[in-house]
A protein has these predicted regions:
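Short helix->loop/beta-hairpin flanking segments within DNA-binding domains
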Residues: 17-35
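C-terminal regulatory/effector modules of DNA-binding transcriptional regulators
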Residues: 134-135, 152, 161-262
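A short alpha-helical element within helix-turn-helix/winged-helix DNA-binding domains
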Residues: 29, 34-47
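Helix-turn-helix DNA-binding motif, specifically the short coil turn and the N-cap/start of the second
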Residues: 50
Length: 262
């Protein structure tokens, strides 16, 4: 009896075989970041396939974020070494208490850039008020920004803090730094500590999903790339919430690492 090939029992489509070969060459380093990949004509000649098949093979790599098409020039390898995000270590007081930015834990030796920082007092969404235990109509200080590594956007973040945390101390150095573009050594958590609201406990919730159109533009995501949506609450030793941070990460740019004892 003849068996009709299916995705379960038949060979993979030719365009996927071509894509797999190119993928392996990118990951093995035979094509370095920025190298031009074989074009449609080269693939047609090498594999004896139609133009549509060659185009599909390149599209697979583009959709996976391993290649980028430059109009009028060709398709180029795009190999980004993922950031290793150390879940607990980056938030330890030992880190930000010593004056380090928590981002320094993630970005190894590559460093990072902060872009588009906007600081403003706003009336936030209802869920933000609820998490920060604020009454309806209350305002918060909102700090919105985007982070880049090697010139690539990898994350956007929006922090919310209650102005009550520095009420009566608006002219203090810590309060001024919280409202400034440069929050100083150790960042916001070090400034909260100086104001008597030391973060002692953090809660993070993470889920993977597909991005909104706005997120795709902001993070310059390739089609089909998921994001990691994170909600983090910082609390004092008395479990009083002092900051709520909403973070969107390029899912292809991160490895999440959690170290803990059994």
């Amino acid at each position: 009896m003849n068996v009709v090939p299916t995705s379960e029992n038949g060979p993979p489509p030719v365009y996927r075989e071509i894509a797999e070969e190119l993928r392996e060459r990118i990951r093995s380093g035979r094509y370095a970041d920025g190298d031009r990949l074989p074009g449609e004509n080269s693939l047609m000649e090498r594999y004896g396939v139609a133009r549509a098949t060659a185009r599909q093979a390149l599209s697979v790599l583009i959709n996976e974020g391993l290649a980028v098409a430059v109009r009028g020039s060709g398709v180029y390898a795009r190999l980004f070494r993922p950031l290793r995000r150390h879940g607990a270590r980056r938030l330890s007081k030992e880190s930000w208490g010593s004056g380090r930015a928590i981002w320094q834990t993630d970005s190894d030796t590559r460093g990072y850039e902060v872009e588009g920082l906007v600081i403003e007092e706003v009336t936030p969404a209802e869920h933000v008020l609820r998490i920060l235990e604020l009454p309806e109509g209350a305002t918060v200080l909102r700090r919105s920004r985007r982070y880049l590594v090697d010139g690539r956007p990898v994350q956007s973040a929006v922090s919310h803090l209650s102005p009550h945390l520095w009420e009566g101390r608006e002219d203090s150095e810590a309060a001024r730094r919280i409202r400034a573009h440069d929050s100083g050594p150790g960042g916001i958590y070090a400034r909260l500590t100086e104001l008597g609201h030391t973060p002692a406990h953090f809660t993070e919730e993470i889920r993977a999903r597909m991005p909104t159109p706005e997120e795709s533009v902001e993070l310059e995501l390739f089609p089909g790339t998921p994001v990691l949506e994170m909600a983090r609450t910082a609390l004092t030793g008395h479990h009083r919430p002092v900051e709520f941070n909403e973070i969107i990460m390029d899912g292809s740019a991160y490895v999440l690492q959690y170290d803990f004892d059994a």
